[in-house]
Curated annotation (Swiss-Prot):
This is Homoserine O-succinyltransferase. InterPro entries: AB_hydrolase_1, AB_hydrolase_fold, HAT_MetX-like. Substrate binds at residues 221, 355. It catalyses: L-homoserine + succinyl-CoA = O-succinyl-L-homoserine + CoA. The gene is metXS. It is found in: Cytoplasm.
Length: 381
């Protein structure tokens, strides 16, 4: 299947203040957006794709000045792909607090003339959804054919169906959860602690010091990356293989340099992440993950929380995902069935753990493709 080709982001400016769940207010702010495909005359074929922790608005295609800059879900979105841009108008939005162009900690605070840094307010999944709704308004989209996301993106899709039930026809929620477990909050806390304890963090105002808490970011990414892979996948990729420059495969160095292939891989991932991601953004997004819990306002009753939803749902999980295990997706399915909602559920046997939602698995892609065929018939796409 062909790629969507060269794409370009554009920036949308919003003058109407946005009141956040914390009570803070953002005045003027901007969101970076990419679109793919054509919006039909009825404006009925729009699909919003919500991104996860370290992703962005750049869902598909490549940038003209960097042919290696493939979008993070390019295998899913494009001409003839499961989310077919020959039929649907797809929008990717970079969320508030991110470090890829939307207003966030790296942006200039108009009150001080310096980057917000640690002064940028805490944002939630619900705040992101309200900001995304303003993007939809700007495009004249009253109702999305679908809102789709994986992991944290799936939480946003679910939140859309709760906050704007009249504006979502279908909610596609993949490898996600209705709330983080204590274990998941603990992983986030350890990752944040690595950043906060880095001497180069400077209380979040490291921009003024001309440094970056790279050590903390590296460790945070290494911790997170372990949780994205399955035990079987790591065993197959690395096992106990040694990494030796001299080619010796069975001798230990008896020191604390990189010894095993898996160590080398994690350090590489950590270094790469520290090159492009912002530490304050990492803190904000992991806290947004922690806070997401739509059942909290209903005494922990997810069925009650979902009682006023009107969308149809596709919920999918992966059997080897232990970060957001299938049992968490089944909680959502049960709550929807308790409310007699239309829900399709698939539990996919893929070996790649949580990151399977990003990969090109035939069974997974066929499932999504078939579901979008159904949506296309409904909207005449």
């Amino acid at each position: 299947m062909e790629s969507i080709g060269v794409v370009a982001p554009h920036t949308m400016h919003f003058a109407e203040p946005l009141r956040l769940q914390s009570g803070s207010v953002l005045g003027n702010y901007q969101l970076v957006v990419e679109t793919y495909g054509e919006l039909n005359a009825a404006r009925s074929n729009a699909v919003l794709v919500c991104h996860a922790l370290n992703a962005s608005h750049h869902v598909a295609g490549v940038y003209a000045d960097d042919p290696r800059s493939t979008g993070w879900w390019d295998n899913m979105v494009g001409p003839g792909k499961p989310l077919d841009t020959n039929r649907f108008f797809v929008i990717g939005v970079n969320n508030l607090g991110s470090c890829f162009g939307s207003t966030g900690p790296m942006s200039i605070d108009p009150a001080t003339g310096t980057p917000y840094g640690a002064r940028f307010p805490v944002v939630t999944v619900e705040d992101w959804v309200h900001a995304q709704a303003r993007v939809a308004d700007a495009f004249g989209i009253e109702r999305f054919a679908a809102v789709m996301g994986g992991s944290l993106g799936g939480m946003q899709a679910l939140a859309w169906s709760l906050l704007y039930p009249e504006r979502v026809a279908h909610c596609i929620d993949i490898a996600s959860t209705p709330k983080l477990s204590a274990q998941n909050i603990a992983f986030n806390e350890v990752a944040r602690s690595a950043i906060l304890s880095d001497p180069d963090f400077h209380g979040g105002d490291y921009y003024a010091h001309g440094v970056k808490p790279r050590r903390g970011l590296r460790v945070a990414r290494m911790i997170g990356h372990i949780t994205y892979l399955s035990d079987d996948d790591m065993a197959e990729k690395f096992g106990r293989a040694l990494r030796r420059a001299d080619g010796a495969l069975d001798a230990y160095n008896f020191n604390f340099d990189v010894e095993f292939e898996v160590e080398s891989y994690l350090r590489y991932q950590g270094d790469k992440f520290a090159d492009y991601f912002d530490a304050n953004t990492y803190l904000l997004i992991t806290r947004a993950l922690d806070y997401f819990d739509p059942a909290k306002a209903f005494n922990g009753d997810l069925s009650a929380a979902l009682a006023h939803t009107k969308a149809k749902y596709l919920i999918a999980s992966f059997m080897t995902d232990w970060r957001f295990a299938p049992a968490r997706s089944r909680e959502i399915v049960k709550a929807l069935l308790d409310n007699r909602r239309s829900v399709s559920y698939a539990e996919i046997d893929a070996p790649h753990g949580h990151d399977a939602f990003l990969l090109d698995d035939a069974r997974y892609h066929n499932l999504v493709r078939a579901y979008y065929e159904r949506i296309a018939e409904e909207v005449g796409a």
